[in-house]
Amino acid sequence: MKVPADVVSHVDAEIKTHAKWMRDNHSYDESKIQLVHYYVSKSDELVNFANPDDGTTGNVLFSINEVYVHPEGVGQHLDAAGSWPDAPSFFEIMAKYGEVLVINGEVIETL
């Protein structure tokens, strides 16, 4: 997501709510919807990524990454989100600020 500086605190709060929901409904073992990994990263957007000395744009970039053990994990995740009370507000920020959304993507490289 590319988020203007004046709404970063709101997006931070939504991500914290999402992370709690993820911990409540997902796991790295078979006890819940099974993930390989989940993480969220955040960074100031650079004017020129090749030269950070050029400064920042004033936007903040967020990346939410979820990788499931089984392909059906994405469907299980979306089904579970249907009963999550905070889903509408989270999906609203994703729709408003998300410039790229990859669902059910294939991991093609890793360490």
Predicted regions and their residues:
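Short S/T/G/P-rich N-terminal loop/turn motif that feeds into the first structured element of a domain
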Residues: 1-63, 67-80, 96-111
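Amphipathic, Lys/Arg-enriched alpha-helical "gate/interface" segment within cytosolic domains
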Residues: 78-80, 85, 91
